[in-house]
Amino acid sequence: MRCPNCNSLDTQVKDSRPTEDSSVIRRRRVCIACNFRFTTFERVQLRELTVIKRNGRRVPFDRDKLVRSVQISLRKRPVEPERVEQLVSAIVRELESSGEADISSETIGEIVMDHLRKLDDVAYVRFASVYRNFREAKDFEAVLGELSGEEEARPTLVRK
């Protein structure tokens, strides 16, 4: 592993452990040349994914871009970073296990929205507003109406 500080290839793993859900290995490393310490993460990649953009352009799937967009929708929400990582890992696992190497950006957006809807309503609305390109207040009202309908359909816990 190349040192991010001095670009030396002479690094050493000092500590290695799985994350809570065991889907990622976290490694603490030290550069022998400059003594810089850094962390790397190792995860399984089932297949190389290609995203087909709305304009037809093909780009390699970028997990970090997915993480950033989920984090933006969850900004200032009471969701732990570990939960975000679990959510992103679940989305990537779903994409990789679909059997398709080429996936449309629309499909990815719908999968992200499904996962966010289960996690946090506010994050879901935020993501939907960008993904679906909301232009008017009625666009928000429609999504909020969907969420309200789901809330009414869910059984409520009655306390005595």
Curated annotation (Swiss-Prot):
Question: Keyword Transmembrane on this protein?
Answer: no
Q: Which domain of life is it from?
A: Bacteria
> What cofactor requirement does the entry state?
Zn(2+)
Q: Which GO molecular-function terms appear in the entry?
A: ATP binding; DNA binding; zinc ion binding
Keywords, alphabetical: ATP-binding, DNA-binding, Metal-binding, Nucleotide-binding, Repressor, Transcription, Transcription regulation, Zinc, Zinc-finger
Question: Residues annotated as region Disordered?
Answer: 1-20
Domain ATP-cone: where? 49-139
Q: Cite the record's Polar residues compositional bias ranges.
A: 1-11
Q: How is the cofactor bound?
A: Binds 1 zinc ion.
Protein name, entry field? Transcriptional repressor NrdR
Which species is listed as the source? Rhodopseudomonas palustris (strain BisB5)
Q: What is the lineage of its organism?
A: Bacteria, Pseudomonadati, Pseudomonadota, Alphaproteobacteria, Hyphomicrobiales
